[in-house]
Amino acid sequence: RELLDVDGNFLRNGGSYYIVPAFRGKGGGLELARTGSETCPRTVVQAPAEQSRGLPARLSTPPRIRYIGPEFYLTIEFEEQKPPSCLRDSNLQWKVEEESQIVKIASKEEEQLFGSFQIKPYRDDYKLVYCEPQQGGR
C-alpha cells in the first residue's frame, strides 16, 4: 500500500516534503538546531512555531521504484538552500546517535555507517520509525 502526502498524492521516491505534526497546536515542522555543546546546528528538532513548516526533506529508497510504501527503508536528507558553512561538506542526511537516540545530521565520513527509516501508518496518519542496521536498515 502506497503512502500519501497531504494533497492525497503518492509519496514519490526522491521527492521533497515538509515533515509536520499531524495535529495543529503541536509545533511546526522539522529543522536543524544547535544542542548541547555543538558549534554547528546538527540536531533535528521540531520548530516551536506552528507556522514554521521547517526544512524540506528528500525521502529516498535504494530500490528504483516510483512511489514509496511503508515496507521500504528510507534515507532522509534535508534540502536546505543555504546550509550553514559548517554543514556545506555534509549531505544533510539523517542518522540516529546510538547512545542518545537523538537524530543528527551525518558527516561525510559517517554516511554509510547507520540505519535508515520507514514511514508507517499510525491511526489516521503516519509515523517515522528508525531501523537499526541489523534490522534491515542499511
UniProtKB/Swiss-Prot annotation:
SMART domains linked to this entry: STI (SM00452)
Cited SUPFAM superfamilies: STI-like
Keywords: Disulfide bond, Protease inhibitor, Serine protease inhibitor
Example of a GO MF term: serine-type endopeptidase inhibitor activity
Site entry: Reactive bond for trypsin: R64, I65
InterPro entries, alphabetized: Kunitz_inhibitor_STI-like_sf, Prot_inh_Kunz-lg
KW Oxidoreductase (keyword) present: no
Statement: the UniProt record of this protein carries the keyword Disulfide bond: yes
Result of changing L11F: In less than 10% of the chains
Effect of V6A: In less than 10% of the chains
Disulfide bridges in this chain: C40-C86
Positions in coiled-coil regions: none
Annotated effect of mutating S52Q: In less than 10% of the chains
Family to which the UniProt record says this protein belongs: Belongs to the protease inhibitor I3 (leguminous Kunitz-type inhibitor) family.
Function recorded in the entry: Inhibition of trypsin.
Protein name: Trypsin inhibitor DE5 alpha chain
